[in-house]
């Protein structure tokens, strides 16, 4: 008989803007924050019983490149015996981590899992490939913030290598989604997010991130930076 999988608790850090308040925080340190908060919130849990920590991460080009799930688990203070694995399904990475954890529990392979994801586009590095020949004078540099890098020419010729924003534009053209309709949807989403934030609906799930300052006390970032007041005129 297949077992059921349940979400027992959920915590996260605030969503930060590109180059915003969280831009100075490494991805592995950021991933450790909710893990440490989860442990503090449930002191009665035997954390050695955790079968695995599964994190999704799409970039993996910089400070998040060496199995960031394991790095975050160690930094958070989870027992050394608890393993970690990082999955990459690009924008669906975090949700894929959740699915992987649920399947492990339902199959009987695991009893207690931690699943989530971490990303820092602000700290995505510029990268350079090695020269293909000795004393080569050619060079290339890739911004790993979003989209492809080290493009396979055969892949590009066969499928294209558009980034997610470019794909969104292509889909809008193909399905004749007018800009005004997109703006109305965006405005509705923003207004709901702002209302939820003001009402305090997100407070329980958010763990504040302490940002050290060169002078004075550290700043606690405990609200999403993304939701903001806007209008159809501003979006047009």
Where do the protein language model's features map onto the residues?
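Conserved active-site "lid/cap" helical segment
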Residues: 1-70, 76, 83, 167-179, ...
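Short coil/turn connectors at secondary-structure junctions
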Residues: 2-4, 48-51, 78-83, 93, ...
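Flexible glycine-/small-residue-enriched beta->alpha junction loops
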Residues: 111-171
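Fold-independent oxyanion-binding glycine-rich loops
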Residues: 9-11, 57-58, 76, 116-118, ...
